[in-house]
Structure formats: C-alpha cells, structure tokens
Amino acid sequence: NRNEGYGGLNQTFFSVGFKVFDFLNFGVSANYNFGKITNESSRQEQNIDFGTFFIKTSSLVGFNYRFATQLKIQLTSEVRLDAMAYYVPKNSLNATNESVYFTRSVTTQNLGDLENVDLAASNLKKTSISLGDQYSFGLGITKAKKWFVGGQYSQRNSADYVNNFISLDNITYANGSRLSFGGFYLPDYSSITSYWKRIVYRAGVRFEDTGVLFNNQALKETGISFGVSFPMAGYSNANIGVEFGKRGSQDNDLIQESYWNLIVGLSLNDIWFVKRKFN
C-alpha cells in the first residue's frame, strides 16, 4: 500500500494600513486563496503485474481576512523596540472534487480499467473545508539600517480542520504552533568603497509543532536558516537563502527525515510620485 499527496494553495491579497499614532499602526488584508490538492493511494501485490490506483483531487477557492497591529517604541535615538500581532478568523475553503479508480501495469505503465466515481450520489462533489483561526505575536529590537534581533510565536487552531473528502485513517489534527528567532546584520549600508559591506546577512531558527498527528504522535519540525541580500541598482535586492531542517521522530517506530530548502528571490523597489525640483 502506498499513499502520496501533492499540491497546495496560492494567495492573492489586498492590504491597507493606517497610522493611529506615531508609534502605533493598524492594518487589514483581504486574501483570495486558490489551488488544487491531490491524494493518490495505490495497492500492488507481488507477482501481479497490474496495481490498483485511487486518485482524489480537490480544486479549492476561498476568502479570509487578517487583522494586524504594529507598535514602535523608540528606546534611544538609534535603537527601537518593535512589537507586532495579527489575527486570522476561522474560515473555510470551497472544494470541487473529482475521483477516479484505475488499474495500471507495473512493467509497461499501460492503463487497464478506469472508472470515474459518481461523487454527486454521495454528496461529495462539492464540499467545504473548515480552517481554524490563527494568531501570532512578535517582539524585536532594531537599530535602523544596521541590525535586528527578535522572536515570534504563532498558533493555528488546526484541531478545527475538517475535510470530508480527502482523509487518512492514521492522520488526525491538533492545534499547531511555531516559535522562531532570527535577525540580520548590515555592516555599512552607505559604503561606497566596499560592496560587501552593503550586503545584509540573515540567520534564524524555528521550532514547530505542525498540528498533524500520525498514529496519535505529534509531527514536529526544527529548522535553521541562513541568507544574504545583495543590493542591486536603485532600491532593489537579490535574496538567497538556505534552510536545513528535520521533520518527525524515530520514537515509536516512526520516521525522521532531514531536508534542505534553497530560497531565491528578488525584492524590486522604487520611489514613486517624486515631486519635481526643476521644470
């Protein structure tokens, strides 16, 4: 027997922020989420060429909102204390589902019998996936254009997660959380003699309870990351980072995996609406 899944969610959003006081900001984001997830289960027997496959696919759409606030307290003329918090209310995703059974040759990969499942008959053609609320708060100290160090705690109430279409017998859910610490260092942002002094160096570490229970055992992750931001023309940057992590545990006959991620991105910035000095 084999189970595998792939896919995920994409997000587009619109955000607006307000300055309540010089030291206090408030913002709200409206998010449109969309994507597709697929679960494939298969069964193959020894000395039998054809295996049985069962594929479930859900196309997902939904909206949610995020409310956030930021507090800035000037400790000295150069050093500032930053605090933040956000909250995402409980929401749901609308799912349009498809399911198919088929047999396939192990040696030639040729398809055998194929049958589309009538999901409408079992009221599973269109379903709703419930997502719990989530919140986060963080605290950090920074010296403008020089360094930053801080931490953040986040919790997702994933015990409320419900998916009536795609589920596994040995997978359940509990509330998940993440605790992370990190910072950056910029040697000299205004240096004109050394390009390397204008590079931002970053590092971080995280400890995460994913909220997924496998055979009633919590699936946890830890990770450490390093990155650099290379200044480009104008106000833009090229960002490169790498993360090394571990997921799972070897306790109770479970599996622990080690992985690494390479992150590459661009931060494209410019100044708009500059008032003319000369006509």
Predicted segments with their positions:
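Outer-membrane beta-barrel porins/channels
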Residues: 1-279
